[in-house]
C-alpha cells in the first residue's frame, strides 16, 4: 500500500522511523516532507501535500506528524475530500478506518514512544473500512456539507 507521509520538525524523527517500518512491512511510503530537520519549519505545507496526494490516490493512505498531531490533522482536513483522524491509540486508529473510512491519521511525535506509534500505524494500515451503511451515511452527510456548505438539519430542533 502507498502511504504518504508529511511532518514538521517535531515529527521528523518519528516519520523516519515510520518510513523504515512501512518499507520493512512491504508498503510503499512516500515522503512529502519535511526532507531535513529545521526547528523553524511550519507543518501546514507538509501536511497539505500529504493529504492532497492521498486524496488523489484512492488506494492509498496518509500519515501526518507533528508535536501533538492536532495542527497536522487540522491542516490535512483542509484538503477537499480528506478525512484525517487524530490517532492516539491502536483503538482510535482502527475506528478511524472502520467507522470513518479515514484516509489519513495524525500522530503526535511528542506523545508516543516509537513502539506505540508503530502499533498505531500498523493498526491504521491493516484495518479495513467496514462499509456499514450507517457509517457511509455519515460520511455522505459530511461530503455533502463540504460540497454545498449547507448544514444538515438538526434532528429534533425547533424552527
Curated annotation (Swiss-Prot):
Residues annotated as the enzyme's active site: 72, 99
UniProt name for this protein: Ribose-5-phosphate isomerase B
Additional information: In mycobacterial enzymes, the usual proton acceptor is not a cysteine, but is remplaced by a glutamate.
Keywords, alphabetical: Carbohydrate metabolism, Isomerase
Function: Catalyzes the interconversion of ribulose-5-P and ribose-5-P.
Biological or metabolic pathway of the protein: Carbohydrate degradation; pentose phosphate pathway; D-ribose 5-phosphate from D-ribulose 5-phosphate (non-oxidative stage): step 1/1
Reactions the enzyme catalyzes: aldehydo-D-ribose 5-phosphate = D-ribulose 5-phosphate
UniProt-listed GO biological process terms: D-allose catabolic process; pentose-phosphate shunt, non-oxidative branch
EC number per UniProt: 5.3.1.6
Keyword Isomerase: yes
UniProt key word Isomerase: yes
Enzyme class: isomerase
Assembly and binders: Homodimer.
List of residues binding D-ribulose 5-phosphate: 8-9, 67-71, 100, 110, 134, 138
Gene Ontology MF terms: ribose-5-phosphate isomerase activity
Family in the record: Belongs to the LacAB/RpiB family.
Amino acid at each position: 500500500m502507498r502511504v504518504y507521509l508529511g511532518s514538521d520538525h517535531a515529527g521528523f524523527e518519528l516519520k523516519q522511523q515510520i518510513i523504515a517500518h512501512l518499507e520493512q512491512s512491504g508498503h510503499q511510503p512516500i515522503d512529502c516532507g519535511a526532507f531535513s530537520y529545521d526547528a523553524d519549519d511550519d507543518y501546514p505545507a507538509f501536511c497539505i501535500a500529504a493529504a492532497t496526494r492521498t486524496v488523489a490516490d484512492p488506494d492509498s493512505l496518509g500519515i501526518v506528524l507533528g508535536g501533538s498531531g492536532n495542527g497536522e490533522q487540522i491542516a490535512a482536513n483542509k484538503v477537499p475530500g480528506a478525512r484525517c483522524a487524530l490517532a492516539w491509540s491502536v483503538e482510535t486508529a482502527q475506528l478511524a478506518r472502520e467507522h470513518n473510512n479515514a484516509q489519513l491519521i495524525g500522530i503526535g511525535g511528542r506523545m508516543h514512544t516509537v513502539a506505540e506509534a508503530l502499533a498505531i500505524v500498523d493498526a491504521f494500515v491493516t484495518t479495513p473500512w467496514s462499509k456499514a451503511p450507517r457509517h457511509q451515511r455519515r460520511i455522505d452527510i459530511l461530503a455533502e456539507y463540504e460540497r454545498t456548505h449547507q448544514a444538515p438539519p438538526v434532528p429534533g430542533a425547533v424552527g
